[in-house]
Design a protein with these regions (language model features):
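N-terminal extension/subdomain marker
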Residues: 1-44, 48-54, 306-340
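Portal/gating segments that form or line small-molecule/metal binding sites
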Residues: 36, 41-50, 54-104
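Gly/Ser/Thr-rich loops at beta-strand to alpha-helix junctions
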Residues: 38-41, 65, 111-121, 145-147
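Long, compositionally biased charged/polar accessory segments in the mid-to-C-terminal portions
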Residues: 55-56, 162-344
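Generic beta-sheet signal
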Residues: 58, 107-113, 136
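Short, conserved secondary-structure transition motifs
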Residues: 142-154
Length: 344
């Protein structure tokens, strides 16, 4: 079960969920802004918490040094460690496996994860008082699904880099939106795809469960951030983020970080989120129909509370509603999604 808290003000407010404030901007540190995926705001906020709020570490996802095409949960304790781990990681990640480290910490910590991770953390902290006490700030980012590791491996193969010679895999960053880059161990070779090419391929490797997720904008966290894509379309050359403040704690930290010049932000409205992230909104309009298609075949479905999916579904044209339901039925049948499978 996932939960959301939609606003009742305007359709735009309803589409993005509960928000105390909405901003647009970037990290004040030019290196963090350049290295980050979309302006470096999450990294800048995490750094502020380490340097000014005396938080012990940031628990998040980084590349696995032994297998650079895979991810692992890491702790960053300073600017250099955060910088080395900036940028998106479009492969499976499970930062919740490090929550025990936060519980054992001597000071509050920052947690950064996907919307599904932060939703899990929010529910878990209600049952684990020490975890709740040590979570200084929970951050998430806009998410369109997590491709399988095979997606990355196939991209590396397309670039004709032998797996045993891969030194690093970078999905984004080093500019906006950045390129998918594979560096060889000898340090002399780097091959790459554009962001559009790489993400276009990786989307085909997302699991079905991601196609049913209504929480791409990260409703269950203190702060959620993502690309201000409309700025890129308008010729903006450096990264910019949409920043949605969800909680009083997030609001307090963000305002302090702005005052301390860690981030440069300007206020915007809910409509700016829709302009920056139209695909997130469009996807949510189809989810109720996908769930309906599964129920018609008696396939179990996840339960979502507070997202008002039927309200979003009603705004679709009749033809698109039919295509969504029928397309889901075809997927369930031809992909064997109706079969029970063991969890490995």
């Amino acid at each position: 079960m996932a939960t959301g808290h939609p606003s009742q003000e305007t359709e735009a407010d309803h589409a993005i969920g509960s928000a105390l404030e909405i901003w647009e901007g970037y990290a004040s540190d030019p290196e963090i802004r350049f290295q980050g995926s979309s302006g470096g705001v999450l990294s800048a906020l995490a750094l502020y918490c380490l340097e000014r709020e005396n938080m012990e570490f940031v628990l998040h996802t980084g590349a696995d040094e032994a297998k650079p095409w895979a991810n692992k949960t890491v702790q960053s304790r300073n600017r250099s460690e955060l910088l080395a781990r900036t940028g998106s990681r479009y492969a499976p990640a499970s930062p919740c496996d490090g929550l025990g480290l936060i519980e054992k910490s001597s000071q509050p910590c920052v947690f950064i994860g996907k919307p599904c991770d932060t939703a899990a953390v929010t529910m878990l902290r209600q049952q684990r008082p020490e975890l709740d006490h040590r979570l200084g700030l929970v951050l998430t980012f806009f998410c369109a699904g997590t491709p399988s590791t095979q997606g990355t491996l196939d991209l590396v193969k397309e670039l004709d880099v032998p797996l045993q010679k891969v030194a690093s895999v970078r999905y984004r960053g080093e500019g906006w939106p950045g390129r998918f880059k594979v560096r060889s161990r000898n340090g002399t070779k780097e091959k790459s795809f554009s962001y559009r090419e790489s993400w276009g391929r990786l989307t085909g490797y997302r699991p079905w469960r991601c196609h049913l997720c209504p929480d791409g904008l990260g409703r269950v966290a203190d702060i959620s951030c993502g690309d201000a894509w409309e700025r890129l379309d308008n010729g903006q050359a450096v990264g910019r983020s949409i920043v949605i403040v969800r909680t009083r704690r997030g609001q307090e930290i963000l305002h302090k970080a702005m005052a301390a010049k860690y981030v440069e932000l300007e206020p915007v409205g809910a409509c700016a989120v829709l302009a920056a992230q139209p695909n997130q909104v469009e996807r949510n309009r189809e989810i109720w129909g996908r769930l309906l298609g599964m129920r018609l075949l008696l396939v179990p479905t996840p339960r979502f509370v507070g997202f008002s999916l039927f309200r979003a579904w009603r705004s679709l044209p009749v033809g698109r509603k039919a295509r969504t339901v029928l397309g889901t039925v075809r997927r369930v049948v031809f992909r064997g999604l109706w079969r029970r499978r063991p969890i490995i």
